[in-house]
Curated annotation (Swiss-Prot):
This is Polyribonucleotide nucleotidyltransferase. Residues 554-613 form the KH domain. Present in outer membrane vesicle formulations which are used as vaccines in human. One of its GO terms (molecular function) is magnesium ion binding. The lineage of its organism: Bacteria, Pseudomonadati, Pseudomonadota, Betaproteobacteria, Neisseriales. It catalyses: RNA(n+1) + phosphate = RNA(n) + a ribonucleoside 5'-diphosphate. Involved in mRNA degradation. Catalyzes the phosphorolysis of single-stranded polyribonucleotides processively in the 3'- to 5'-direction. Belongs to the polyribonucleotide nucleotidyltransferase family. It comes from Neisseria meningitidis serogroup B (strain ATCC BAA-335 / MC58). Gene3D superfamilies: GHMP Kinase, N-terminal domain, K Homology domain, type 1, Nucleic acid-binding proteins.
Amino acid sequence: MMFDKHVKTFQYGNQTVTLETGEIARQAAAAVKVSMGDTVVLVAVTTNKEVKEGQDFFPLTVDYLERTYAAGKIPGGFFKREGKQSEKEILTSRLIDRPIRPLFPEGFYHDIQIVAMVVSVDPEIDSDIPAMLGASAALVLSGVPFAGPIGAARVGYVNGVYVLNPTKAELAKSQLDLVVAGTSKAVLMVESEAKILPEDVMLGAVVYGHDQMQVAINAINEFADEVNPELWDWKAPETNEELVAKVRGIAGETIKEAFKIRQKQARSAKLDEAWSAVKEALITEETDTLAANEIKGIFKHLEADVVRSQILDGQPRIDGRDTRTVRPLNIQTSVLPRTHGSALFTRGETQALAVATLGTSRDEQIIDALSGEYTDRFMLHYNFPPYSTGEVGRMGAPKRREIGHGRLAKRALLAVLPKPEDFSYTMRVVSEITESNGSSSMASVCGGCLSLLSAGVPLKAHVAGIAMGLILEGNKFAVLTDILGDEDHLGDMDFKVAGTTEGVTALQMDIKIQGITKEIMQIALAQAKEARLHILDQMKAAVAGPQELSAHAPRLFTMKINQDKIREVIGKGGETIRSITAETGTEINIAEDGTITIAATTQEAGDAAKKRIEQITAEVEVGKVYEGTVVKILDNNVGAIVSVMPGKDGLVHISQIAHERVRNVGDYLQVGQVVNVKALEVDDRGRVRLSIKALLDAPAREENAAE
């Protein structure tokens, strides 16, 4: 037998999931092919048995890649092969990474790489859940010290009922799109967007997803028992109490002093001073990587212990706040003169400059997804320059973190956007993080909402976001509102909630430990709501509702014409529409149903374009009088062609020019002459008969008799 193949199948919601190993990619530490319906993902895990010199963090790399052949397509563009990772690929890579990372032991610094490749796709079944299950199974089979497996589930909420792993069609009707991942004991990660749902429905979805994923976790465990992989013989380094005492002796007091300093830069400088003292005393050129890492680890633990014990003992936090207080807020709108909408949102030492721009339907982003091409009328881009944390750094393409934070802020605002038929603009928000000390993504939600209102977008409600932290030791725990950067790194859970006064629009959770219960999450969500309402009050005081459209934003005018008139508006080879746009300085889009959208920089230009289109599409009415221009004298003295509207000509027969007998048309009419005509008839082919005579008084009978 060439292949030692193992297969495990289980039912997951309405889908059948199959895990296979031993046939493909046998040189990887472990490889699992996951099928869910027709969606197939191949996940391979490779590991490095040696730790690299100087390695002082856990080097886990996750790459989720979509191949266009999976959907039976050939890539577009010049090169005809897959290029840089798409936003969906980056976000899914993060989705796999986040629940897996905390399950590796502390002090484990071996390289681990996970590559998940989508090789077949069913447009109704998203490949992210199979990729997460595949990564979980492959890690268990690789034998590395991984405290998994994890399960992952997508949860929808349709007509008041939770739906496990909804299809794309079901998601379209769902008020919720939530992905949850966790182990058999605890939830580790949540990523979601919702249409303004109450906290208890959100928490219910998390608990429901965690219950349902146990099927997948059990299946992976059974699969591993069958394959029976060889486990790594890796032991966590034992704590060297003597070394801990040395580090504490050198730096303990300085660390305590540092965490009493409320200003971030000064606090960081004090901590650097403490670390330098430790380095000088204990690390020499001869110290190997393992020993240096041990000292770094002890130092980090000391930092964490100081902050955590202060908070759990009920002492004030690093910056002097209690656990429930939001840092001071400052809100300014319309801060940039030529932009369509702008806001500067400052919360303590975190600040976002958010700018909204309005465009036309031509500005929509075209997304070429595996499941099919679609357009997006709302974009939110998040930028995190190095100066926001007072550092020197490289400016370049957005990093994975920036893509992830931008997507979270976007998901928070989607639920309150006006319907396209009520507001046909394309919207782009850019959030420039100008200062950062904790939860800049939530500052982007608040700033983004304010900038859209400043641009005149009729949002259904104000949206605010808040980042929460949690510290848990034994049976003591503290939930922290509006966490600082330091609290984020030293805490056990970081979760972000965005929403309106009515409910939640986005929830993201990352949990680093296994003991967080439903009750703790409930308390945390309630505390987050209190903070959100406080921020919303201040936002509403600053901007009550949508402002007037900026003078610099395009004006959109919509009108509806008969579908059979579309050809006339476009003209031969697009001639008519080009001349209208050139003359009026507007941009015109025509939909197949006859809806015309005119984008203009001024009201006058928009009205002018609208008038031209109305003239082209207008019908000649029988009995109506028009001012027309003679465009042609017909041969053989038949009559003249008179233009009564743009693109609408009619015939004035020789008998309809005057009451007396006309011998020669040229004696009465010249090309270019302006005449008043009355429409006599429009035949079924659209030909128009006109009369000049009908508007002239008939000569008196006596004069006729006298002649």
